Amino acid sequence: MTAAVAQQASPSSRTAVSKLALRARAGLPIATAALTLLAIGIWLVTGASELLEYRRGAIASGEFWRAITGHLTHWNADHLLWDAVMFAVLGALVERTSRRAFLATCAVSAAAISATLWFCRPGLELYRGLSGIDSALFVFQAGWLVREALRERRCVAALLPTVALAGFAAKIGYELATGATLFVDSAAAGFAPLPLAHVIGAAVGLLTLGAFVRKLGASANQDHMHQQRRRFQELLFTKCDAN
């Protein structure tokens, strides 16, 4: 199917698709695996979560790393299970499309969520969890699938990720309205859900997807210009040889 589409596409589109195919075959999603194992390791090591969690007072005292590492800490095994499984699956999908896009989405969403909590939730002392970053990865991957399906005029294929995005928006709406989570029993775990982190994560996923698509388009245009220049040079040399 991919080969058939590539043959019908323009040279620049074929080049862009070929680059993505090469990246997809580059190997296992190592960064995703490493971060997932790191989150599990932090949970298993006694005292690590307390040292790395988002703790407002400690950050104010200069422990700035907590703003990033806090996303790798969790409240209980159930919380870790849901977050880590979603991160592993979504991260692997995004990383196989582009490792740079995966790392950028994780880094920007982690920083943006912590900054938002710092400025908009000054009364929040503690925060843990990968769910905000999971939200960013989900929106990136679902949006990418929609974009690719529409680019190839496969409207039916675009339906499922579109429905998934709508369901995700409904989930966030439910969390905002009820203050409860759908998948993790936050009350039993002794922590309060924070839908704001999911909203910020989703926004970051959309922004990083847009940046990735623009960069991909710019790269395709540049490759097309190089091809045109080579063709012109070949034509010029052919005329010179004929003379």
Residue ranges and their predicted role:
Residues L80-F87, R128-V139, A189-L209:
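Alpha-helical transmembrane segments that form the membrane-embedded catalytic/substrate-binding core
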Residues P29-T46, F87-Q141, P161-G173:
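Small-polar-interrupted transmembrane alpha-helices in polytopic inner-membrane proteins
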Residues L150-L165:
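Membrane-helix boundary/juxtamembrane motif in polytopic membrane proteins
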Residues V45, A92-T97, Q141-R151, L207-L216:
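Structural signal for the C-terminal ends of transmembrane alpha-helices
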